[in-house]
From Swiss-Prot:
Native source organism of the sequence: Methylobacterium sp. (strain 4-46)
Gene3D superfamilies reported for this sequence: 2.40.50.100
Stretch list, region Disordered: 1-22
Family: Belongs to the bacterial ribosomal protein bL27 family.
Protein name as annotated: Large ribosomal subunit protein bL27
Lineage, uppermost ranks: Bacteria, Pseudomonadati, Pseudomonadota, Alphaproteobacteria, Hyphomicrobiales
Gene: rpmA
GO cellular component: cytosolic large ribosomal subunit
NCBIfam families: L27
Amino acid sequence: MAHKKAGGSSRNGRDSEGRRLGVKKFGNEAVIAGNIIVRQRGTRWHPGTNVGIGRDHTLFALTDGRVQFATKQGRAYVTVVPAQDAPAREAAE
């Protein structure tokens, strides 16, 4: 005879994995066309100049350049300043 009652199994102990959302390229960072700048759910950040938006609201660079974040009328925008317009930081270093 068993001297202890069999323990029940827990039905907890699992969680979904994180979705790896957020800003991937920050302000003044260099990007090339096609680079993902922001992965998001919904439009927390809106696409500005030279930035495209994917079906899942991912923002990506349409041209080579540098990332800029700006707020206009309560909306956050992400733009890419083309490489020839941006100050050449690499040349100075």
